[in-house]
């Protein structure tokens, strides 16, 4: 609504006096019971904002982008602001090279994971420079402002709400994998065709290859073999029933509020317990909030708010993925059996080492856990000095403490394979295997503790003066001081025994390890404990800012806005010229509908507003610096001296990233029932890039400014209310946006692998999107053997040269990120019944399909591990001459393997199967339409509520993630998640107030 008051974090101002691109949505309109945080509910709700999920596990934060990508090396997330307080990025001490931390990254959450959606009143998204410039350097990726519910000045009100949610369990009907019979016969056909294995299959009663070898070596009779074969064909183990579940979640919220005009209060407590679809993944969270308002005198208002949150998320060890295992494991395997996973020569004992594996055992004896405790307090003081002058002080403090751990016990295959060398409890202390093991007891534990505290202090002077009803002035002067300190430790220990009081058993001292071959050198595992096991970080970022805003409305139809902010950061320590970053914006709007001509002749045009803005935004990469970054290490073996490593050489010219923004918009409302907004924007960013350095610098690369990024786009929002009566109403909401993104000139050499991989952290080719990728050009299958063939890659050796651009023999496949997003919502009400629907649409992205040969070994030339299942697409592979007319799936790799041949630019070529996997034959549209929610609610009539002494009562039923329409070539996988699915869920809720 044009007359509503917009809370922009720093000030309250009428929307009609704002020129920037702003979208406000009410939290109650987007609540989805199957999600626990507000960021997960935003997909398809706002034009120009792309929300994509990376995992279906509970506790995982989605990826959010507003108006494309404006940085290559920096944080691309929007700035989150809660009740005027900037939420600092949560920094976690995780070693990027440590495999055990990968499972933790998925469940830690983000800046607003602590916030209970039930406490939120509305969400405002700021998109252009005029709207975001007031937030300075942190706002270059857009701003998401959250306003929590305010106190009521009424009698005591108590509200209770509850939601109970059931999520659907996955099943094999959703996917395209072979059943037991198909998998056994596929192995038989491959064996008959002479396809090789990377190593001789083990003798194992759980695999076809295992019993075939046992038959060949006369360990079983032909009759026994046939019986085992028939049993395997009909076993059809349902891994989804063993590893996943119908998840159950429940949420409860209690709130109280009341007070008078002099003093009001509100308090709320929320509890959520959510199970993931994978057995072992769950989240438990409790939140609390207290808000007090005191008005000792008419012109002075004091608000105090306290927030708290305690959360625990359980996940899996890095090598344990139930969903992936269920889809990729051979269904002939008995789920309770231990099958051979490794059978090889142990160089230390001089013996053949046999290790067995059972996934359920692996899952039950490993895991990861993330615990988070969040607390924040804010004080807001408003003093109305004059009727048109207000002073406001805002102070905020927050503390986020997290404890994370990932572990694997001595009972796991991981420990046996990586450290011990034999199955748990399979040898005696006097055996050669035991004496050769440096970790005969215990497993491994990775712990990570983080404490981040930040404060925010604001002093603002706001001027709001109406010279007459049609001329208004709004101005603001302010300063802000922000500081964020993150301290963390990470530690990895060996010998962890959780079932014996969580003790640590010391590894065997290297001098006591008895091995006939290859004894351990140095300290072995003990050396890792001292040199790599422990890590600590202590990082502080300080910002001092001064800002001002100006908004003037003349005759209620001509509006001018101006914003300026100056940020100073300690990131650019020594160079005072780069330490300060001014951001500014200007905007004009013309409310044509207020002109006399429209008022007299075109009254049905209730709103017609033209807007235009320009602004400059800055962005500081807090993890980069123009200074020398030297890491002091321990003692260098062999030299017996302390040593240091260079993380970054000095670059005094490194400065803030800068983005220039233009935005033009039109707001149109007809008959007060049809509202439309159309926006066009352009953005040009000078981003920090990574450049390669000569060998003599002693470091591979450095950061510098100079990566030009262009974004332009169109956004469209429509709201239509064709019927609005007392007992019946219908509302339709539609939003759509298209973003064109491309990189500027780049002089950095790129190899073939970079173009095939694509991505958006580097500019690959001028004029192409940042997420562009290329593929080999598929030329069909060889009719004689089913081998894939390709265009442009085979040239005479004398014509090959390192100077050849890889894109001359690769074909452009598109971009991995969607360039068109949309959302559609219907709201229908009949008396006390309401029906709401929500759809999201993402178009334009391209993805590589999962390859049916992905589990084949030896670069795709050898059969997969017998324990792996394979895609049913291989039933439609090339099998005989003539099949190449009907299929593009290569035949089994029985052709001679080509080794050592090169591409036109002399890069080494991959195998034919690997090239086919990265060819345009395997590129598919990643576009999809998802029905996110269908909700039905019933509101009890007031007279009925009075009979039960209730103020209100509502019952609601919701279905989330009902269906998704995407390319059939995904064969059941969700195009958003690629290798998993978003589970359908059903919920029943109650809301009652007294």
Annotate each language-model stretch with its function:
Residues 169, 173-174, 183-188, 337, ...:
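A subset of solvent-exposed loop/turn segments in beta-rich extracellular surface proteins, enriched
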Residues 414-416, 423-428, 842-949, 953:
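Extracytoplasmic gating/loop element in the C-terminal half of outer-membrane beta-barrel translocons
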């Amino acid at each position: 609504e044009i007359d509503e008051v917009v809370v922009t974090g720093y000030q309250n101002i009428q929307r009609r006096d704002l020129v920037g691109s702003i979208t406000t949505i009410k939290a109650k309109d987007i609540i989805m019971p199957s999600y626990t945080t507000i960021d997960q509910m935003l997909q398809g709700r706002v034009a120009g904002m792309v929300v994509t999920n990376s995992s279906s596990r509970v506790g995982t934060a989605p990826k959010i982008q507003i108006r494309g990508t404006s940085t290559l090396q920096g944080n691309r997330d929007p700035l989150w602001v809660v009740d005027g307080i900037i939420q600092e990025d949560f920094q976690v001490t995780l070693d990027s090279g440590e495999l055990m931390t990968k499972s933790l990254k998925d469940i830690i959450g983000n800046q607003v994971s602590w916030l209970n959606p039930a406490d939120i009143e509305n969400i405002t998204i700021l998109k252009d420079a005029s709207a975001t410039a007031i937030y300075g350097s942190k706002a270059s990726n857009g701003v998401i402002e959250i306003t929590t519910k305010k106190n009521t000045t009424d009698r005591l009100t108590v509200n209770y709400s509850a939601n109970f949610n059931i999520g659907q369990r996955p099943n094999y009907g959703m996917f395209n994998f072979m059943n037991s019979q198909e998998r056994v016969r596929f192995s038989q056909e491959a064996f008959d065709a002479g396809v090789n294995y990377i190593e001789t299959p083990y003798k194992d009663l759980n695999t076809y290859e295992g019993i075939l070898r046992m038959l060949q070596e006369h360990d079983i009779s032909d009759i026994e073999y046939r019986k085992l074969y028939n049993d395997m064909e009909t076993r059809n183990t349902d891994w989804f029933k063993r590893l996943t579940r119908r998840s159950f979640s429940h949420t409860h919220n209690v709130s109280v509020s009341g007070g008078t005009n002099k003093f009001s209060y509100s308090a709320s407590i929320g509890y959520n317990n959510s199970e993931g679809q994978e057995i072992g993944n769950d989240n438990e969270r409790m939140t609390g909030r207290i808000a007090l308002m005191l008005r000792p005198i008419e012109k002075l208002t004091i608000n105090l708010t306290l927030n708290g949150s305690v959360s625990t998320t359980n996940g899996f060890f890095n090598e344990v993925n139930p969903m992936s295992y269920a889809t990729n494991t051979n269904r002939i395997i008995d789920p309770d059996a231990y099958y051979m996973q490794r059978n090889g020569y142990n160089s230390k004992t001089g013996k053949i080492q046999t290790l067995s594996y059972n996934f359920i055992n692996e899952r039950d004896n490993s895991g990861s856990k993330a615990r988070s405790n969040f607390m924040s307090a804010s004080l807001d003081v408003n003093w109305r000095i004059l009727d048109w002058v207000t002073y406001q002080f805002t102070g905020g403090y927050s503390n986020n403490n997290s404890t994370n751990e990932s572990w694997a016990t001595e009972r796991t295959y991981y420990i046996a394979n990586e450290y011990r060398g034999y199955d748990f409890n399979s040898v005696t202390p006097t055996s050669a295997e035991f004496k050769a093991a440096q970790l005969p007891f215990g497993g491994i534990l990775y712990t990570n503790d983080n404490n981040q505290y930040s404060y925010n202090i604001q002093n603002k002077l706001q001027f709001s003066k109406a010279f007459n009803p049609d001329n208004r002035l709004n101005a603001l002067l302010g300063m802000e001081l922000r500081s964020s300190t993150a301290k963390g430790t990470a530690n990895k220990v060996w010998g962890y025994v959780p079932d014996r009081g969580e003790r640590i058993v010391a590894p065997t001292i290297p001098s006591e390890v008895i091995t006939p071959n290859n004894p351990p050198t140095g300290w072995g595992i003990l050396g890792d404990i001292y040199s790599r096991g422990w890590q600590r970080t202590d990082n502080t970022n300080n910002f001092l800012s001064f800002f001002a805003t100006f908004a003037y409305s003349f005759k209620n139809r001509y509006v001018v806005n101006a914003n300026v902010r100056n940020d100073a950061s300690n990131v650019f320590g020594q160079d005072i010229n780069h330490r300060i970053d001014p951001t500014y914006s200007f905007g004009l709007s013309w409310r044509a509908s207020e002109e006399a001509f429209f008022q007299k002749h075109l009254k049905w045009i209730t709103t017609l507003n033209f807007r235009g803005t320009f602004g400059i935004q800055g962005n500081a990469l807090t993890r980069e610096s123009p200074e020398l970054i030297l890491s002091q290490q321990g003692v260098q073996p062999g030299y017996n001296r302390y040593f240091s490593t260079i993380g970054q050489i000095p670059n005094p010219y490194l400065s803030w990233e800068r983005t220039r923004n233009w935005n033009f918009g039109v707001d149109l409302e007809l008959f007060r029932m049809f509202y439309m907004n159309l926006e066009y924007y352009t953005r040009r960013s000078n981003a920090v890039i990574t450049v390669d350095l000569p060998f003599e610098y002693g470091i591979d690369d450095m950061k510098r400014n100079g990566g030009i990024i262009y974004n332009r786009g169109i956004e469209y929002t429509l709201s239509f209310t064709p019927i609005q009566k007392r007992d019946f109403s219908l509302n339709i909401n539609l939003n759509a946006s298209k973003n064109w993104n491309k990189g500027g000139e780049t002089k950095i050499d790129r190899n073939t692998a970079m173009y095939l991989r694509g991505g958006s952290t580097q500019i690959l080719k001028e004029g192409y999107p940042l997420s562009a990728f290329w593929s080999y050009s598929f030329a069909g299958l060889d009719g004689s053997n089913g081998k894939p063939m390709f265009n442009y890659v085979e040239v005479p050796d004398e014509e090959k040269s390192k100077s050849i651009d890889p894109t001359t023999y690769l074909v452009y496949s598109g971009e991995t990120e969607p360039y068109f997003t949309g959302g559609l919502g219907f709201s229908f009400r009949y008396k006390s019944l309401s029906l709401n629907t929500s759809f999201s649409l993402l178009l334009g992205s391209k993805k590589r399909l999962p390859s049916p040969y992905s589990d084949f070994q030896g670069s795709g030339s050898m059969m997969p591990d017998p324990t792996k299942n394979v895609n049913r697409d291989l039933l439609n592979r090339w099998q005989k001459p003539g099949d190449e007319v009907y299929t593009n799936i290569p035949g089994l790799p029985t052709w001679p393997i080509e080794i050592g041949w090169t591409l036109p630019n002399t890069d080494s070529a991959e195998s034919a199967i690997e090239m086919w996997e990265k060819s345009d034959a395997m590129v598919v549209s990643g576009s999809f339409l998802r029905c996110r929610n269908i909700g039905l609610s019933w509101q009890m009539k007031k007279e009925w509520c009075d009979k039960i002494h209730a103020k209100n009562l509502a019952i609601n039923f919701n279905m989330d993630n009902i269906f998704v329409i995407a390319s059939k070539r995904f064969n059941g996988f969700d195009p958003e998640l690629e290798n998993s699915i978003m589970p359908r869920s059903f919920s029943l809720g109650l809301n009652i107030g007294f």
